[in-house]
């Protein structure tokens, strides 16, 4: 109860502070550049200057927060990446040289690119197919709700659920893991799925695909509904079958939205951390960049320089895709 009251008071205080800020800054601006009581060129000049400054007064808190929580951490991370374990001794590019020669880093890069090849493609594909199918059945909204539900679960929560599905017990013991129970029922031998090198990456990917398919489905369903009916009717009149209508008429018209969904999931994949941490903690050759960074910075490594260098690599991989995604989304919204 105390936490709820504290949260409410914090929200009220925040609103009051914002209101006081906007009121006082506008008051000061009108005092410095008054237009009331002024005439002619002076009034026009003051009004023009005040109107040009006023938007920046509204943007100032957001710009301050952006600088404090985004720009400063980026600069600090780059600076730390050029220093040693304690962040004190300048070592230049030694941390980046270490990364190139480190086997675990190379394994993490390989795993991340493996995730990039599989997760965005399958999440977008399943989302598109499900969106197209559920729009044609009367219980489609119920199906969409069920498929979207994993989006409401945290990555750690989803990992715990799937950890039970992949659970392994020795042969002869009762299998509580759903997957091994099915394998044993079919006459097979139980497997420790998440400890199988290379293949365990795919078992972890299933979790993120399970979550992100709902996201892709919702966005692509809205895009499909925005396709003009006239184009589909014209294709039917011309004798096109269902496959031709879908792949040659519908998909090309929503290609921009598909690209936005794909790249959004790609950005998420490059930063994947929670699932790997909760399922394997990077063991059995399942390490990824974000978890490796966490290990070096906050665990046994305790090396802020190397951890920051890995963070910079993640940023370099994410930023170009993020910029392209924003531009493409802006172009799509402008087109509609």
Curated annotation (Swiss-Prot):
It is a multi-pass membrane protein. It is found in: Cell inner membrane. GO terms for biological process: transmembrane transport. CDD domains: TM_PBP2. Part of the binding-protein-dependent transport system for alpha-glucosides such as sucrose, maltose and trehalose. Probably responsible for the translocation of the substrate across the membrane. PANTHER family: ABC TRANSPORTER PERMEASE PROTEIN, OSMOPROTECTIVE COMPOUNDS UPTAKE PERMEASE PROTEIN GGTC. Belongs to the binding-protein-dependent transport system permease family. MalFG subfamily. This is Alpha-glucoside transport system permease protein AglF. The gene is aglF.
């Amino acid at each position: 109860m105390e936490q709820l009251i504290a949260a409410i008071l914090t929200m009220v205080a925040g609103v009051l502070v914002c209101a006081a800020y906007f009121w006082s800054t506008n008051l000061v601006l009108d005092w410095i550049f008054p237009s009331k009581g002024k005439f002619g060129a002076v009034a026009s000049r003051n009004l023009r200057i005040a109107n040009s400054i006023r938007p920046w007064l509204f943007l100032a808190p957001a710009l301050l927060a952006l600088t404090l929580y985004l720009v400063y951490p980026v600069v600090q991370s780059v600076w730390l990446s050029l220093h040693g374990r304690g962040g004190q001794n300048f070592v230049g590019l030694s941390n980046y040289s270490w990364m190139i020669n480190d086997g675990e880093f190379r394994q993490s890069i390989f795993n991340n690119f493996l995730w990039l090849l599989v997760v965005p493609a399958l999440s977008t594909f399943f989302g598109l197919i499900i969106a197209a199918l559920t729009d044609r059945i009367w219980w489609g909204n119920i199906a969409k709700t069920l498929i979207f539900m994993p989006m409401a679960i945290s990555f750690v929560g989803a990992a715990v659920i799937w950890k039970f599905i992949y659970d392994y017990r020795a042969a002869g013991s009762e299998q509580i893991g759903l997957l091994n129970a099915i394998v044993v029922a079919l006459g097979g031998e139980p497997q420790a799925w998440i400890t199988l090198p290379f293949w365990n990456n795919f078992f972890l990917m299933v979790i993120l695909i399970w979550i992100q398919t709902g996201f892709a489905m919702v966005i692509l369903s809205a895009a499909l509904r925005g396709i003009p009916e006239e184009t589909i009717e014209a294709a039917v009149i011309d004798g096109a079958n269902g496959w031709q209508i879908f792949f040659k008429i519908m998909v090309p018209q929503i290609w921009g939205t598909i690209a936005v969904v794909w790249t959004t999931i790609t950005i998420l994949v490059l930063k994947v951390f929670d699932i790997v941490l909760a399922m394997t903690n990077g063991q059995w050759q399942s390490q990824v960049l974000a978890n490796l960074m966490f290990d070096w910075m906050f665990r046994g490594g305790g090396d802020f320089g190397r951890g920051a260098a890995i963070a910079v690599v993640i940023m370099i991989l994410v930023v170009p895709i993020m910029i392209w995604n924003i531009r493409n989304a802006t172009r799509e919204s402008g087109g509609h």
